[in-house]
């Protein structure tokens, strides 16, 4: 069960996870590399964390059968991670497939997310 609520506003996602308000911004740096900016606010303190995520075409096909765009997969991956660990525990740079080494349920969660959001 998801503990996050998500509201998309102008290409940014506003999240509430475990009582913390967060703004998630995904920036495509190249066809395979994405910047992720997480602005979090808890008890009137604001913090910004910046990440680099690599998603190859092969990764996208393996995880999603190319049914979603890379930026949407990165967005889902960060929501998934933030539901499970504090922002400070997320590696600053990683390939998206490494998530399943720490969270074996990630590929299945991706498939469930795609199936729930299929048109």
Stretch-by-stretch model annotation:
Residues 87, 116-119:
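Ser/Thr/Pro-rich, acidic low-complexity intrinsically disordered regulatory segments
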């Amino acid at each position: 069960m998801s503990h996050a609520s998500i509201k998309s506003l102008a290409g940014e996602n506003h999240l509430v996870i475990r009582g913390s308000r967060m703004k998630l911004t995904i920036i495509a740096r190249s066809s395979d590399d994405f910047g992720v900016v997480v602005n979090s606010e808890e008890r009137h303190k604001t913090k910004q964390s910046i990440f680099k995520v690599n998603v190859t075409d092969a990764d996208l096909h393996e995880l999603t059968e190319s049914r979603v765009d890379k930026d949407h997969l990165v967005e889902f991956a960060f929501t998934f991670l933030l539901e499970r660990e504090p922002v400070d525990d997320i590696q600053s740079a990683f390939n998206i497939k490494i998530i399943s080494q720490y969270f074996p349920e990630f590929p299945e969660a991706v498939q469930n997310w795609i199936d729930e959001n299929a048109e």
